[in-house]
Structures are given as C-alpha cells and as structure tokens.
From Swiss-Prot:
Belongs to the CheB family. Involved in chemotaxis. Part of a chemotaxis signal transduction system that modulates chemotaxis in response to various stimuli. Catalyzes the demethylation of specific methylglutamate residues introduced into the chemoreceptors (methyl-accepting chemotaxis proteins or MCP) by CheR. Also mediates the irreversible deamidation of specific glutamine residues to glutamic acid. Residues 9-126 form the Response regulatory domain. Its main location: cytoplasm. Gene3D superfamilies: 3.40.50.2300, Methylesterase CheB, C-terminal domain (3.40.50.180). It is found in: Cytoplasm. Contains a C-terminal catalytic domain, and an N-terminal region which modulates catalytic activity. The active site is at S173, H200, D296. One of its GO terms (biological process) is chemotaxis. This is Protein-glutamate methylesterase/protein-glutamine glutaminase. GO terms for molecular function: phosphorelay response regulator activity; protein-glutamate methylesterase activity; protein-glutamine glutaminase activity.
C-alpha cells in the first residue's frame, strides 16, 4: 500500500449522483484506493474534508450553492490536500479549470459531456493513475497560491515576422500549467528563438491555456495551427488530441499537426515534437523537460543532444511530479538540472550560446 501500509482515501465531490457513483466505482475498483466520503456541493465538500481527512479530493468545477473554485480556495487555505478537478468539456469549464490550477489544484480530469458512463470508464486508468500521483505530491505544493500574474500590455506596434533559426522545445504534464505560468512572464520579448510547447491537455483546454499564457507573457503565445511558421519571439502550444511536429518548407520551419497513435498514452506527446525539432533545427535546439508523470520527453532529449543541442531538466525539489524530468536525467543526456525559477534564464543563456556558436558540452549542474 502506498501510504504507510494503508489505502489512499479519496473524497468525491460532484452534484450529480450518477457521476459520484461512476467515480466511486472506478476508485473502489483499485485495491490501493478507497472512497472515504462524498459531497454534492462545495459547502458539503468543506465539511467532509474536515470529517474524513482524505488524501486526495476529486472536485467538480460546476456545482450549486458553492462551486468548485470557491470550495478549492477554502480547502487549500484551511485543510491543504491534493485536489483533482473534474471539469466539463466546455469553454467555461476549461477557463475555470485553468484558474483552479493557479489556485492550487494539482491536476484535472475532463468530464465528457455525452455518453458519460462509457467515456468515464475509458478514463478509468487515467483517473486511478492521477489519484495515486496526486497522493504523493509533497506538502510544500499544497497551499492556496493564486499565482500573482500581471496582465501584460503588449506593444501595439506590429513585430516583424522572422522565421526562427533556434527552437526551444518544452515538455510538461502534471503540474505544468502552474509552473509554466510562473516562468513564461520571464521570457524576453526579443527572444531570438521560437518556443514549441507540449502540455498534456485535452482539446479546448489547450486553447484556454494558450490564451492565459499569452495574457501574462511579453512574447506572443498561441495554440498551434497546421502550417504555422515558427517565428522568433513566439510560442506555439500543441492543441489537444493532436501531435505537433516541425518540418521544413521553402527553407522555413513549419508546424504540422497529426492524429497518429498516442505515444506514452497521450496525444499530444512531446517526443515527436522534440525529435522533429532536432531534425529541423539541429544543434540550434534547446530541449526542456518539466514536471509531469511518465517519461514523455526523454527520447526527445536524447535526439536533441545527439544533434548537438542544449538540454535542460527541472529539478526534483521544484517539480510537482518528478517523473518526466527524472526519466530525462536518467538518459545521461541532460546538460542542466535547474529549479523552476532558473529555467527562463538558463534557456536565454542557451539561446545566446547557440547564437554565438559556442557549445555547453557536458555541464550537469544540480541546483539545490
């Protein structure tokens, strides 16, 4: 058993009795998990958190009396516990979920809008895996932490479109949205590279997330579209349910999207993006693997290093989930292991080194 020889206790919060039953059946089907209680709205959720002291809470976003966001604020302030949001596949649901991640939720699971029981059963493995990972999250990440982000007033002048000669390829999963929102404001407007970002998210959520990132960043951020030219000072977020790759067309780096089979159980996956970026940009590629479960991005790091690029991984102390960075580091192909707050400056330095024609070589530095 994962927690001192006992089962992981889960509180299920949803206004739909049917949804609560579906989630309870899924959770109780795993020998390491048990539902310790249930609640129909945010007010009941706060009472039940105090009563059954769960290890993890699954929290519906939209509920009567008190919604999931308001309940989350109270729970994180009074009884810090890992929370996984259960979100409807709507624009409102996606926007609220991004806010919830900023407020301290660890992760989210999309709630399909039709044929709920069939779709949720398909999500069984994902739900169980996310609950188990959430239960392991260190307590230092559990607090009400509305990320203080200022909406950036971007220069109104139209920036010239310059095809990127350097690519920064970033992979992130669980804990990624919160972490990326902290570092993207630090990238300079005149970054002489294009950023390619794969954040594991379903359709709809990536668009909301790209808009949120754009609102706090000096660089332009958008959800990637088929045929986008990768340009300097711009970031492209892989859309949910599509792999994002890079190819050369008429001498320019161009984004292509496809629905090839899932890799590591996800689509988009970071590996195909990073591998094709390395093929197109060669030694002018910077690879970054951030917080997340699994090992997506590790193969991408290997291919970037083989081409002579520069590779970076987030350290364990600042990773909400250390799975992906750990897998990347274990390849032996990571140049820099740095805390979250040092990622932007390390990326900027790497871009400067590439522009100057230098090479970092094997400088593995683990920052405590």
């Amino acid at each position: 058993m994962p927690l001192m020889g006992r089962k992981i206790k889960v509180l299920v919060v949803d206004d739909s009795a049917f949804m609560r039953k579906v989630l309870k059946d899924i959770i109780n089907s795993d020998p390491e998990l048990e539902v310790c209680g249930e609640a129909r709205d945010g007010i009941e959720a706060i009472e039940m958190v105090q009563k059954c002291r769960p290890d993890v809470v699954t929290l519906d976003v939209e509920m009567p009396r008190m919604n999931g966001l308001d309940a989350l604020r109270v729970i994180m302030k009074r009884y810090p516990v890992p929370v996984i949001m259960i979100s409807a596949l709507t624009q409102e649901g996606a926007d609220a979920t991004i806010k919830a991640l900023e407020y301290g939720a660890i992760d989210f699971i999309p709630k399909p809008s039709s044929s709920i029981s069939i779709n949720m059963k398909e999500l069984k493995d994902e739900i169980i895996a996310k609950i188990k990972e959430a239960a392991k999250v260190p307590r230092r990440f559990l607090e009400l932490r509305r990320i203080r982000l200022l909406r950036v007033q971007k220069a109104k002048k139209v920036k010239p479109s310059v095809p990127a000669r350097i690519a920064v390829a970033i992979a992130a999963s669980t804990g990624g949205p919160q972490s990326l929102l902290k570092i993207f404001p630090k990238f300079p407007e005149d970054l002489k590279a294009g950023i390619l970002l794969v954040q594991h998210m379903p359709p709809g959520f990536t668009r909301s997330f790209a808009k949120r990132l754009d609102s706090v960043s000096k660089i332009d951020v958008k959800e990637a579209e088929e045929g986008d030219v990768v340009e300097e000072g711009k970031a492209y977020v892989a859309p949910g349910d599509y792999h994002m790759e890079v190819t050369l067309r008429a001498g320019k780096p161009v984004i292509t999207l496809n629905k090839k089979p899932k890799i590591h159980g996800v689509r988009p996956a970071a590996d195909p993006m990073m591998i094709t970026a390395a093929q197109v940009f060669g030694r002018r590629t910077v690879g970054v693997v951030m917080t997340g479960m699994g090992r997506d991005g590790a193969q991408g790091i290997v291919e970037i290093k083989k081409k002579g690029g520069i590779t970076i991984a987030q350290d364990e102390k600042t990773s909400i989930i250390f799975g992906m960075p750990k897998a990347a580091i274990e390849t032996g192909m990571v140049d820099y292991v740095v805390p979250l707050e040092k990622i932007p400056e390390t990326v900027v330095k790497a871009v400067e080194i590439i522009r100057g024609g230098g090479n970092l070589g094997r400088h593995v530095t683990i920052s405590r």
